[in-house]
């Protein structure tokens, strides 16, 4: 190779390659088949539902941050910081592929030993239903235990919980919006059968919604 040709080769190898724009780089790594999964719609509820089912955790036990699902993106976003000094007594989330009258997935409070990071999912067993009215609208909560926690997995009904535990849950939901001047009413806890019925109803409502969407 001549000296002139060698110098040209060196110059071309040292010249910086054009860097594609960010959106071009992102699009080049994605296809229509590799869109990020949506935790509400893409995660299955589980073969044992409505008895045992998957739960996507939104809020960690002991947190003052009110996280919630962003229904458009599927990401977990910060909704607000609680106005009072209370913290969530247990992990809180939703059941995938369910739908309630407020157009949200069904809410669940999961009792277990440890806090779980927002965005993770776990298997839970329904043990009861907490009927609740939030600012005049129905906003019932499923009370569940982690099906893979050795301390809680044997619970099958809410009557097996200590009265103090039930009072702790009730008081949290009665008080956590008081400083926002928002009224919440909690009715008597209902047994596991009522929880199973509520979950099944929300599963059916979600299925109807999907069929209606496909027919459009």
Curated annotation (Swiss-Prot):
What's its EC?
3.6.1.1
The Gene Ontology biological process annotation of the record reads: phosphate-containing compound metabolic process
Q: Where is this region: Disordered?
A: 1-21
Q: Which organism is it from?
A: Arabidopsis thaliana
Instruction: Decide whether keyword Transport is in the record.
Output: no
Q: Where in the cell is it found?
A: Cytoplasm
Name of the molecule in the record: Soluble inorganic pyrophosphatase 3
Q: Which GO terms describe its cellular component?
A: cytosol; nucleoplasm
């Amino acid at each position: 190779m001549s000296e002139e040709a060698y110098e040209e080769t060196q110059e071309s190898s040292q010249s910086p390659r054009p860097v594609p724009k960010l959106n071009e780089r992102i699009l080049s790594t994605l296809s229509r088949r590799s869109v990020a999964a949506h935790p509400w719609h893409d995660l299955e509820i589980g073969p044992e539902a409505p008895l045992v089912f998957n739960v996507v955790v939104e809020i960690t036990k002991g947190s003052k941050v009110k996280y919630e699902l962003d229904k458009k993106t599927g990401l977990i976003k910060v909704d607000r910081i609680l106005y009072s000094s209370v913290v969530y007594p247990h992990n809180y989330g939703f059941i995938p592929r369910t739908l309630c009258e407020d157009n949200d997935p069904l809410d669940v409070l999961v009792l277990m030993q440890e806090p779980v990071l927002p965005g993770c999912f776990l298997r839970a067993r329904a043990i009861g239903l907490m009927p609740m009215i939030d600012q005049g609208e129905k906003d019932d909560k499923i009370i569940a235990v982690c099906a893979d926690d050795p301390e809680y997995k044997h619970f099958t009904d809410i009557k097996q919980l200590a009265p103090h535990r039930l009072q702790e849950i009730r008081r949290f939901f009665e008080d956590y919006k008081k400083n926002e001047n928002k009224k919440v009413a909690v009715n008597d806890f209902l047994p596991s059968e009522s929880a199973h019925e509520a979950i099944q109803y929300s599963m059916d409502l979600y299925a109807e919604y999907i069929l209606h969407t496909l027919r459009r």
